[in-house]
Amino acid sequence: MSRIESLTRARIDRSKEQATKTREKEKMKEAKDARYTNGHLFTTISVSGMTMCYACNKSITAKEALICPTCNVTIHNRCKDTLANCTKVKQKQQKAALLRNNTALQSVSLRSKTTTRERPTSAIYPSDSFRQSLLGSRRGLSSLSLAKSVSTTNIAGHFNDESPLGLRQILSQSTDSLNMRNRTLSVESLIDEGVEVFYNELMSDFEMDEKDFEADSWSLAVDSSFLQQHKKEVMKKQDVIYELIQTELHHVRTLKIMTRLFRTGMLEELQMEPEVVQGLFPCVDELSDIHTRFLSQLLERRRQALCPGSTRNFVIHRLGDLLISQFSGSNAEQMRKTYSEFCSRHTKALKLYKELYARDKRFQQFIRKMTRSAVLKRHGVQECILLVTQRITKYPVLINRILQNSHGIEEEYQDLAAALGLVKELLSNVDQDVHELEKEARLQEIYNRMDPRAQTPVPGKGPFGRDELLRRKLIHDGCLLWKTATGRFKDVLLLLMTDVLVFLQEKDQKYIFTSLDKPSVVSLQNLIVRDIANQAKGMFLISSGPPEMYEVHAASRDDRTTWIRVIQQSVRLCPSREDFPLIETEDKAYLRRIKTKLQQKNQALVELLQMNVELFAEMVHFQALKAGFIGMPPPTLPRGLFRLESFESLRGERLLKDALREVEGLKDLLLGPCVDLPLTAREPALPVEADSGSCPGVTANGEARTFNGSIELCRADSDSSQKDRNGNQLRSPQEEALQPLVNLYGLLQGLQAVVVQQERLMEALFPEGPERWEKLSRANSRDGEAGRAAVASVTPEKQATELALLQRQHSLLQEELRRCQRLGEERATEAGSLEARLRESEQARALLEREAEEIRRQLAALGQNEPLPAEAPWARRPLDPRRRSLPAGDALYLSFNPPQPSRGHDRLDLPVTVRSLHRPFDDREAQELGSPEDRLQDSSDPDTCSEEEVSSRLSPPHSPRDFTRMQDIPEETESRDGEPTASES
């Protein structure tokens, strides 16, 4: 039993091992089958981020990708099912399939003679005629697919499940080879046979005309006998006209090649994204429509100029009217927009084409096979883009040559001259638009490269961020060298914009504002540009706010000259800060956008009203023609009513007066000059209803007419009433009433436009509400005509400017008022102090006057008792107010000055004759002497002093010995004023 169990256990283990090996083999086979797709044997590799996928043309960002070592194709893992068959394996499969098909078909034909009927080989491979029909009738390349040509069930025929297995395999292999052949035929069929077919189809409309313009010139295209009938000037003119039509035909062919061959092939065959194809061929549909229409007009003019019985001989005498219609009006505007867009994106389109050609192998193969054809040998993508860009520059040259040979017909010469002016204006506008679009693209590129957090402070204005750049237009830019205060040169990018100069630096492949010793944003207001005398490339930029001087250096002398010229032009055109603030807040930006939209809506409303007037005039003219007035010219439309740029267009009172004048003239025509309108008829708010009966009126010849709600335009009965004395035909009153009616309608519509604009204006000027507007309306009604005209003459642009000016004046007045208040307070304080000082000085003056009067009386009384000798030696010297130390000897005796006596409470002074010899006291000495009251108080009881004491005080000492005794007097006994008291004497 143990042996049997061991054998059983061994058998079970072997079965488990076999099952495990089988599962592993199946897994390996599944993994191999997963890698083997469409003949590709994919292996997993690691790639970098710059590797492009062959299937979707996108970068492979994953760490692992699939590569086929047979054909060296690297793709995403998700793109392996969309990849075409392997090129090297496909060739082997085709050869093997052909061999198998030949042997299989022979065996099938031998076996199926008795069982089934033989099927033709066209069921497997389409015949040449069928293939040509497919190529000739196709509009896309999807018609060659297997599903639309031959089906698998049709190939299998009536085979059932009992059919031999080998036959089914042969048929399936032949079907696969057919499917493979159809897939490879997609691009190759277009290149080998489809290009010429496509070209013939797209030029089928101009096939006959293209053959007529195969010759190089008109002289070679017409018959020689017909050529000899014309002068040399006519031949030159016709040669240029022939060249114009021929080059226009070639231009249309170029545009159709771009649209129908290249673009269609890229979209349908290469499955490229529409945005990429649009970047390669911008606005080609619009350009094709414009030039196809123009070419049709030129060819129609040629057919009209053909000689009878000939298809080659023609002479075009008039071409100016056709050129004027092409290069003016809506056609010119459409050409301007399309050519501006195309030419501005010309550089980007060429750059994109070169990038695609360098990195995309399928695109490169497509372009090579397309240009292999004889039709497209000289019409590659780059050549087509360049030809379209240069086409608009050829028109002025051709028209100028036609003009030089058109001196015979004056009207034609004037039309050609006008057309030449229009073409030059169009070319100038396109050039300007291209320049602006290029600058906008350049500004957007700089904006995208700037650091989002980059800001620079502007003195007194706040931070200047990168969003402020988009508010402005880029005028000029370039790299310069900025010389700093330390003498070093820094590379900067200088942007000349609408109102500022901006200095930028590049850091970590991003632009930031310069962080040097001076502001990086310079206002163009009062900016001075000067070149450096001793340097060929340097220039100074001197700004006034804040006062700074920048020294920059250009790359060359011509570059510096260009910078100086464009900066000076921009300084002259720089807007004011009231119209264009340096830094705009979000609220101001939103308000500006709203005002712009409001102006656009007003403009659209005015255009609609103008269109309304035109339609009304057309309707009235049509009714007049229906009424029997054949040959009546259409009424002229009133001009100048809908021009927003003129102040006169907004004077509603003038329009109303003109409307009333038209009503009076219309009344005179319909009712007669002697009939007055009733008061209700003058009011515009009372229209005549259709069912209100008839309104009697009197015509010019006295016949009664009835006007049922509208004016009937009818012809007069007799022709004699419509002729004057000279027999000239006169216009009937109804005909004369037509023009005033149109004028009246236009004036009323213009008045409506004025009312709407003024309402918008008042709403913008007075946001407080309707009460303010009612008050203003009442005030204006009292002011009279001058006030109404002033309010009506305000345009939205003018009111915005005046509002900004008023706000600026209000802020300035507020600042001036505050400054005046502070100055008034300072002046009031100063005036109070001056008044206090004035009162003190008045009191001191009155006191001094009283003292002087008292001293005069005392001197007069003293002079009567003992006059002072004027020749006294001590009277010749000035009075010393105080002595701290006394000299000894004769010098002290000779320099003695007696003290001034005092009597009572009054001070005794010297006589006027003696005092006039003394020098006046200065301020310090007067301070030391003190006031008269102080000096009088220092004396001890002046009433007890006798006259002898007074005389002794005034007499000099008798000898120098007395001076010796006087030296012993201590200084403490002297008075502060330098005068001895009565006790000391």
Curated annotation (Swiss-Prot):
Modified-residue entries (Phosphothreonine), positions: 680, 795, 944
Where do the segments described as Disordered lie? 1-32, 890-909, 918-985
Q: Which PROSITE patterns match?
A: DH_2 (PS50010), PH_DOMAIN (PS50003), ZF_DAG_PE_1 (PS00479), ZF_DAG_PE_2 (PS50081)
Q: Note the Gene3D superfamilies from the entry.
A: 3.30.60.20, Dbl homology (DH) domain (1.20.900.10), Pleckstrin-homology domain (PH domain)/Phosphotyrosine-binding domain (PTB) (2.30.29.30)
Basic and acidic residues composition bias: which ranges? 919-938
Q: Where are the zinc fingers (Phorbol-ester/DAG-type)?
A: 39-86
Sites where N6-acetyllysine occurs are at 354
PTM: Phosphorylation of Ser-885 by PAK1 induces binding to protein YWHAZ, promoting its relocation to microtubules and the inhibition of its activity. Phosphorylated by AURKA and CDK1 during mitosis, which negatively regulates its activity. Phosphorylation by MAPK1 or MAPK3 increases nucleotide exchange activity. Phosphorylation by PAK4 releases GEF-H1 from the microtubules. Phosphorylated on serine, threonine and tyrosine residues in a RIPK2-dependent manner.
> Which keywords label this protein?
Acetylation, Cell cycle, Cell division, Cell junction, Coiled coil, Cytoplasm, Cytoplasmic vesicle, Cytoskeleton, Developmental protein, Differentiation, Golgi apparatus, Guanine-nucleotide releasing factor, Immunity, Innate immunity, Metal-binding, Microtubule, Mitosis, Neurogenesis, Phosphoprotein, Proto-oncogene, Tight junction, Zinc, Zinc-finger
Region span, Interaction with DYNLT1: 131-161
Any one GO cellular component localisation term in the record: cytoskeleton
Does this entry carry the keyword DNA damage?
no
Enumerate the spans annotated as DH domain. Answer: 236-433
PTM annotation (Phosphotyrosine): residues: 893
Domain (PH): give its ranges: 473-572
The role this protein plays is: Activates Rho-GTPases by promoting the exchange of GDP for GTP. May be involved in epithelial barrier permeability, cell motility and polarization, dendritic spine morphology, antigen presentation, leukemic cell differentiation, cell cycle regulation, innate immune response, and cancer. Binds Rac-GTPases, but does not seem to promote nucleotide exchange activity toward Rac-GTPases. May stimulate instead the cortical activity of Rac. Inactive toward CDC42, TC10, or Ras-GTPases.
Subunit (UniProt): Found in a complex composed at least of ARHGEF2, NOD2 and RIPK2. Interacts with RIPK2; the interaction mediates tyrosine phosphorylation of RIPK2 by Src kinase CSK. Interacts with RIPK1 and RIPK3. Interacts with YWHAZ/14-3-3 zeta; when phosphorylated at Ser-885. Interacts with the kinases PAK4, AURKA and MAPK1. Interacts with RHOA and RAC1. Interacts with NOD1. Interacts (via the N- terminal zinc finger) with CAPN6 (via domain II). Interacts with DYNLT1.
| Identification of the protein by name | Rho guanine nucleotide exchange factor 2
Q: Tell me the organism.
A: Rattus norvegicus (Rat)
